[in-house]
Regions:
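Mid-domain alpha/beta scaffold segments of enzyme catalytic cores
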Residues: 1-157
Length: 157
C-alpha cells in the first residue's frame, strides 16, 4: 500500500537531527510522497534543500502562510515569493489562506495577500493549498469572487 503525506513541515529545525531517519521510516511504512508547504521566506531554503536531497519523495510548494502576513515584512515576502516562482519548480502555491485564530486585526491584509497568491497560482497554473482557521466564510468569498475555472486545490485546515 502506498500513501502520500499531503502536508508536512519536515524541513523545520525540529527535525534537523533525525530527518534522514524520519524519511526512511516514512518510506518503509509506505509513505513515499511527502508534500512540503512553505511557511515564508525563512523556511524556503531548508524546504528546497530537503526536496533536492529527496527529489523522488519530497515535493515543495511556495507561499506565505497567513500567520506570516505582517505589515512590516509583506513587501519583502512577496518579492521573495515571486522570485522563487521564477527560479524554481513547485508543486503548488501553499500554504496560503486566512487565519483569525491568533490575531483578528490583520484580516484585510491577509485577504489581500491571499487574493494575490491565488492570482499567482492562476498565472503559473498551479493548484493551491489553503489554510483557514476561524475565517472560512471570508476565504470562500475570495475564491468565489475570483471565479476561475483553472483554479484547483485543497483545504488543509
Amino acid at each position: 500500500m502506498t500513501f502520500i503525506d499531503t502536508h508536512t513541515h519536515l524541513y523545520l529545525t525540529e527535525f534537523k537531527n533525525d530527518i534522514d531517519q524520519v524519511i526512511k521510516d516514512a518510506i518503509e511504512s509506505g509513505v513515499t510522497k511527502l508534500l512540503l508547504p512553505n511557511i515564508d521566506s525563512s523556511t524556503t531554503e531548508s524546504m528546497l534543500n530537503l526536496s533536492k536531497k529527496y527529489p523522488d519523495n519530497c515535493f515543495p510548494m511556495i507561499g506565505i502562510h497567513p500567520c506570516s502576513v505582517k505589515e512590516e515584512s509583506i513587501k519583502s515576502e512577496l518579492m521573495h515569493l515571486e522570485m522563487m516562482l521564477l527560479e524554481n519548480k513547485f508543486l503548488a502555491i501553499g500554504e496560503i489562506g486566512l487565519d483569525l485564530y491568533w490575531e483578528k486585526t490583520s484580516l484585510s491584509l491577509q485577504q489581500e495577500i491571499f487574493t494575490h497568491q491565488i492570482e499567482l497560482a492562476i498565472k503559473y497554473e498551479l493548484p493551491i493549498v489553503i489554510h483557514v482557521r476561524e475565517a472560512f466564510d471570508e476565504a470562500i468569498k475570495i475564491v468565489e469572487k475570483l471565479n476561475c475555472d483553472k483554479l484547483s486545490g485543497v483545504f488543509h485546515c
